[in-house]
Amino acid sequence: MKNTYYITTPIYYVNDVAHIGHAYTSVASDVIARFMRFCGKDVMFLTGTDEHGQKVEKAAINQNIDPQTFTDKTSQNFRDLMVAMNISNDDFIRTTENRHKKAVAVFWKKLLDNGAIYEGFYEGWYSVRDEAFYDESEINEDKLAPTGAPVEWVKEPSYFFNLAKWQDKLLEFYELNPDFVRPISRRNEVISFIKSGLKDLSISRTTFHWGIKVPNNRKHVIYVWLDALVNYISALGYPDKQSNYAKFWPANLQIVGKDILRFHAVYWPAFLMAAEIPLPKAIMVHGWWTNEGQKISKSLGNTIDPITLIDEFGVDQVRYFLMREVIFGADANFARNNLITRINSELSNKIGNLLHRIVSFVYKNNDAKVPLIKSGVIDKIYELPILKTAIKFAQENILLMDKTEINKILENIINLAEDANIYITNEAPWNLKTTDPDKMLEVLYSLLEVLRYIAIMLQPFVPNSANKMLDQLGVSKEERLFKHLVRDHALKAGSNILEPSIIFPKFN
């Protein structure tokens, strides 16, 4: 069984301004990638930018620059976002790179050789904003697509992909793989769309030039979505069987927003089937963000800049909020007060305060060392309810991540911190110092050990802060994986701890 794990974000369209939706997708994918690394997996984590299409060509013309210069500039905005959000991607693919163009040409030829592509004439509705074709039944009386994007009637020669042929095979695949698309509401949406009847898909354009040329007819450029979807394998070195493609494909998880579900859950599987390439194992679909209950749009002037939030509150605080606030897959609402409440109530009061109280007490009252207690006493401590809860949550969190229930993992961690705060209040080590010094050392050790569990489990979510916590506790950098959340890797009695410092400050 392969110990690899391949996760992808969608590649971001360079015409967009990096916003909270991009940050959310990137952080969620990053949390999963980091989590799998802490599980001991060999992880490949991909993100990047989608840089071709009519919309990009028009934007470049409007700025009086060539499209490549335009995309070089705008792609950098997304690289900057990855750095700012502390995203640990292993690769960043651009669809204007030669490695991608070569892979797309090979993929096209494979479809052509397999009889999945034919030449014809397209006449129908097209949205430049969505870079998508729409059926007559999907267009409202104002000539808008379901997304609200304006559409135009297009007539041009085109190559077609025989999508209709794959309808029954797609339905059969969904029947055999019920967890391929999550959550189930999105799976049902996809199945309903397929059952409504698939039509062959136009996959080339002749009315603009900014794209990858069709290998067998350079008057055409390849449809931007066919081009873009291939990024998930081009970044691995497709079709080279000696590359990461052989090692990591099929992807374990592809994260997408609900607005691009059809492309990833209908077109992409059909393309792969036609090219005789294995399908990814799962697609996880997340919702949209609103701002104080209002739809986010440039025209309303209520877009949320994640960089501004990071500058004000800190990267770990913003990462935590994005993952804690919403059930992954559902829509979410950004409210500034909720962000501040999450930081103050959970990170500062429940985790930060617990750490500071315990480490300060040990630092002052035990010569800055983990209490020197015997191995048999540590065994006894591991029978305490608080340690049993820590072990249970550590095991449960692995299962929760398999179901992408990210916010529940954080809920477990916060519940453990709450239990530890109750435990320290009930045991009152400051009183035991004079009445029962040995018991005081046991209580302090058990609390330090619970903090070790909390900090190790927090690492995928708030990496910088969790590492500071582990540094304060004196946990070596070699013992911070999830496999170390066991009795055999408990804190070493008598080892040094660092002078405490505030890790999660409060905000007004």
Curated annotation (Swiss-Prot):
GO biological process: methionyl-tRNA aminoacylation
Function text: Is required not only for elongation of protein synthesis but also for the initiation of all mRNA translation through initiator tRNA(fMet) aminoacylation.
Enzyme Commission (EC) number: 6.1.1.10
Chief location bin: cytoplasm
Keyword Cell cycle set for record: no
Motif 'KMSKS' region location, chain numbering: 295-299
Key word Flavoprotein present: no
CDD domains: Anticodon_Ia_Met, MetRS_core
Organism the protein comes from: Rickettsia prowazekii (strain Madrid E)
Motif interval(s): 'HIGH' region: 12-22
A cellular component annotation (GO) from this entry: cytoplasm
Annotated family: Belongs to the class-I aminoacyl-tRNA synthetase family. MetG type 2B subfamily.
Subcellular location: Cytoplasm
Top-level taxon: Bacteria
Matching InterPro entries: Anticodon_Met (IPR041872), Met-tRNA_synth (IPR014758), Met-tRNA_synth_2 (IPR023457), Methionyl/Leucyl_tRNA_Synth (IPR015413), MetRS_core (IPR033911), Rossmann-like_a/b/a_fold (IPR014729), tRNAsynth_Ia_anticodon-bd (IPR009080)
Protein's name in the database: Methionine--tRNA ligase
Subunit organization: Monomer.
Reaction(s) catalysed (UniProt annotation): tRNA(Met) + L-methionine + ATP = L-methionyl-tRNA(Met) + AMP + diphosphate
